[in-house]
Amino acid sequence: MQTNQNSTPMSDQLAQITERQCQTAPAAYSDLKALFLNCTLNRTPVLSHTRGVIDIAKAIFEANGVETKVIRPVDYDIAAGLGVDMAQTPEWDKDDWPQIQKEIDATDILVLCTSVWLGEKSSVCNRVLERMYGYTHLLNAKGQYRDYGKVGATLITGNEDGVKHCAMNILFSLSHIGYTIPPQADAGWLGEVGPGPSYLDPGSGGPENDFTNRNTTFLIWNCMHLARMLKDNGGIPAHGNQPDAWDAGCKTDFKNPEHKR
C-alpha cells in the first residue's frame, strides 16, 4: 500500500546536482529495486512528514532507473511475535506481516524510515525489526543467512534529538539480521526542538536543508554503488559464513571437536 500524499519537490539546487550526477554515474542501476518502509505512526491518508524525506531519496533512486516502492507498515495488521506467520499460531487470528516480508524479499535495497519519539525510533519501526528478526533462522540458496547480499539504510525525522541514536540502533539491527550497510547509511532532519514546524510544514526549511539533502544524496548513491557491487558479484561469498557447514564440523580456521571427526 502506498501513501497518496503529494510528492515533496526537490529544491532547484538538489535537482541540478542530481541531474549532473546521473549523467556521470559510474554504472547502471536500472535493474535494482529499493523499498522504503515508512514507519510513521500515521495511517494513510494522514500526512506523514517522514514521507517528505523519503520523496527526496525516492526521486534520486528513480532518476537512476531504480524501481521504488513505499509501504506504511502501520496500514497493516502486524502481529507481535517472532514467527514467520503469527496467524498460524494460537496467539493471533490475523497477521499481515508475510505480505510485507514478500516485498522485502523482492528488493535489493531496504530503507527503514522512522520519526523520533522520546529519543527512540517509532514503535512501528521496532515491530518491523522484530518481525524481520523472526526470519533469521532461514537460509538463502548458498546456505547463508537469508538476507546476505541485501543493502540496508535509514532515514529519520523529528522535532527532538535522537537521529543518530535511532540510526545506531536501526543500522546495527539490519547488520545483525544480515544486511550489508554502506558508508554514511543514515540521514535525517530535525526541526526546532519542541512543538515547532515539522518537515513538510510551511516555513520549516526541511526540503531546502542543505545538510539533510547532502546526507540523503550520499546515502542513496552509496546504497546504489554497494547494491551494484553485490549484485554483480553474486552477493557475499559463501565461505566461512554458512551455519549448516559450521554445525557439520566444517569450522573454518578452527579444529573440529573430537565428536565431529
Whereabouts are the PLM-identified features?
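Short, surface-exposed amphipathic charged segments that create phosphate/polyanion-binding patches used
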Residues: 196-204
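Short, glycine-/small-residue-rich phosphate/pyrophosphate-handling segment
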Residues: 48, 141-194, 211-214
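N-terminal beta1-alpha1-beta2 submodule of the flavodoxin-like/Rossmannoid cofactor-binding fold
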Residues: 1-142, 206, 210-261
